[in-house]
């Protein structure tokens, strides 16, 4: 019963609103007053692009629904609200309802109103700090900084800074005394800021009138456009000083169409036998079928977000000419995961708190790679070689044979490079190559909203002769541009197996801040020469996680939500 009563009340209010609209449209027809009023800008003052879009919409209504827009008959929602004592929100709601019936067409408009803040009211009442301080300095014919601060406090500091900036007061450095640098007497001074605030208080409800009055008291400029710009800059300055605050007022122009009527027939969706027999259907409006609306999308069978992002990265790498590496082995020996990458055996990353060590089998097989390569790695770690001093410690074969869950896919990069080194030793030629991989890695880390014990690493590398830092930066710029990050910054960092090394930061447009999006560098000679490559061969490489760009792209706050049913809804 209560719902029915509310519905009847809404119907009655809508009928009264229609009657009021009819009266206003009639006044427009008779020329009895312009209902655009001074509360907002004229409808005809719209930009050319907006006007063109509006005309196109009117033409579409005429062709598709036989609706003719009567542009000369219009009224604003603000006028309807004030004249007929209806809440503005209700006017907006009823106008939108009528637009769905094509009785009217609505155009949303907005303008700013300005009012004084508490600080602005204080300045209007007591005078602005810049005027008060300048007047005091002129009356005293000079004073000290201490006198000014003691007498006016914080207000004195504000006024002094403004006057020093405008060069109306000079500070003599020898004795810290202040002197006026303006002509005339203290009594002839005009408080300009106070004058501006008076205009805001008087005309703040009408942005156009406020700009016009401010132009009247500002120094004359050459050209109407410059004067208006000066007035707008002054308003911005007052807002910046928090002396005034702006409030955006949104309203609509309600424009009549040829379908407008003072009564609304109740809509029905079905014609029944009784409605036709009793001819009651004439009281109602039969709702038309909408053959263009889409049904509700069923959330099933969706591709996982990480798989979707992984495919995107693969497409980028392939388009840039990269080949995918074999990364199927989740379990690696410490040799490939650490030692071959010139990471010392006492490095913190090889501790239990960072790495998952395998219990069974604890050690890898005896002949896990060429013995000569193992000896080269042992020598460069223990005593150094290839121009390096090494790490100078007792290298142990037992430690390098321990099995681990790989902590990075760079271990697979190392395997791929070693195969190329063996081909070079056979043929004596270096064929430039580009490799990439995207696969899981494992870290013994505490779980939180941004860290997981397992995640995906995206890695790319290029091998060629005499590659340098400029090649790396150029490649990174091209790669990240493909994935939608065009603004990059590079920061020096340290990696055991690359030198030089760089962290890559990308600018996130939505969050308006720089985020770390990867790590990069040039593989060290201690790593490449031990494999058997000649000195002129270089390898540039970079890596990033798959999860972070996925979280940014799909606005996911908790990394754990990437796994499970939530990630496909």
Curated annotation (Swiss-Prot):
Q: Which GO terms describe its cellular component?
A: cytoplasm; cytosol; phenylalanine-tRNA ligase complex
- The answer to whether keyword Lipid metabolism applies is no
- CDD domains for the chain: PheRS_alpha_core
Gene Ontology molecular-function annotations: ATP binding; magnesium ion binding; phenylalanine-tRNA ligase activity; tRNA binding
Where, in this chain's numbering, is Mg(2+) bound? 499
Family annotation (InterPro entries)? aa-tRNA-synth_II, aa-tRNA-synth_II/BPL/LPL, Phe-tRNA-synth_IIc_asu, Phenylalanyl-tRNA_Synthase
User: Into which family does the record put it?
Assistant: Belongs to the class-II aminoacyl-tRNA synthetase family. Phe-tRNA synthetase alpha subunit type 2 subfamily.
What is the recorded name of this protein? Phenylalanine--tRNA ligase alpha subunit
What is the organism field in this record? Plasmodium vivax (strain Salvador I)
């Amino acid at each position: 019963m209560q719902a029915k009563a509310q519905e009847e009340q809404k119907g009655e209010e809508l009928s009264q609103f229609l009657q009021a609209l009819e009266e206003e449209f009639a006044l427009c027809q008779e020329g009895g007053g312009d209902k655009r009023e001074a509360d907002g800008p004229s409808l005809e003052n719209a930009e050319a692009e907006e006007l063109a879009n509006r005309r196109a919409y009117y033409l579409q209504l005429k062709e598709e629904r036989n609706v003719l827009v009567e542009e000369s008959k219009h009224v604003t929602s603000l006028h309807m609200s004030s004249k007929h004592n209806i809440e503005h929100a209700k006017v907006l709601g009823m106008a939108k309802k009528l637009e769905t019936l094509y009785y009217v067409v609505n155009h949303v408009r907005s303008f700013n109103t300005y009012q004084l803040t508490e600080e602005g009211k204080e300045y209007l009442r007591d005078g602005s700090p810049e005027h008060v301080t300048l007047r005091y300095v002129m009356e005293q014919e000079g004073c000290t900084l201490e006198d000014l601060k003691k007498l006016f406090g914080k207000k004195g500091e504000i006024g002094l800074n403004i006057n020093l900036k405008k060069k109306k007061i000079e500070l003599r450095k020898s004795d810290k005394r202040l002197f006026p640098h303006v002509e005339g007497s203290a009594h002839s001074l005009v408080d300009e800021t106070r004058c501006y605030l008076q205009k805001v208080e008087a005309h703040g409800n009408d942005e156009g009138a406020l700009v016009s009055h401010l132009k009247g008291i500002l120094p004359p400029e050459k050209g109407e456009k410059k004067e208006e710009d000066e007035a707008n800059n002054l308003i911005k300055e007052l807002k910046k000083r928090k002396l005034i605050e702006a409030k955006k007022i949104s309203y609509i122009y309600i424009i009549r169409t040829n379908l407008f009527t003072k009564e609304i027939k109740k809509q029905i969706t079905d014609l029944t036998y009784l409605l036709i027999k009793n001819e009651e259907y004439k009281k109602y409006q039969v709702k038309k079928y909408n053959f263009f609306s889409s049904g509700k999308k069923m959330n099933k069978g969706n591709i996982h977000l990480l798989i979707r992002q992984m495919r995107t990265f693969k497409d980028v790498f392939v388009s840039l000419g990269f080949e995918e590496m074999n990364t199927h082995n989740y379990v690696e020996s410490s040799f490939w995961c650490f030692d071959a990458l010139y990471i010392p055996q006492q490095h913190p990353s090889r501790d239990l708190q960072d790495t998952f060590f395998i219990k069974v089998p604890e050690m890898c097989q005896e002949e896990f790679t060429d013995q000569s390569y193992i000896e080269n790695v042992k020598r460069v770690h223990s005593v150094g070689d290839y121009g390096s001093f090494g790490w100078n410690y007792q290298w142990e074969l037992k430690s390098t044979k321990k099995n681990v869950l790989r902590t990075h896919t760079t271990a697979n990069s190392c395997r791929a490079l070693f195969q190329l080194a063996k081909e070079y030793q056979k043929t004596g030629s270096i064929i430039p190559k580009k490799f990439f991989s995207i696969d899981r890695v494992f870290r013994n880390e505490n779980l939180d909203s941004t860290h997981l014990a397992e995640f995906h690493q995206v890695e790319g590398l290029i091998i060629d002769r005499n590659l340098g830092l400029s090649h790396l930066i150029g490649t990174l710029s091209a790669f990240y541009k493909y994935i939608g990050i065009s603004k990059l910054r590079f920061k020096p960092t340290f990696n055991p197996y690359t030198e030089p090394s760089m962290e890559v930061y990308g600018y996130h447009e939505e969050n308006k801040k720089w985020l770390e999006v990867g790590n990069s560098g040039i593989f060290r000679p201690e790593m490449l020469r031990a494999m058997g490559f000649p000195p002129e061969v270089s390898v540039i490489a970079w890596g990033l996680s798959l999860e972070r760009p996925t979280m940014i792209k799909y606005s996911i706050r908790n990394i754990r939500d990437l796994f499970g049913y939530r990630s496909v809804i």
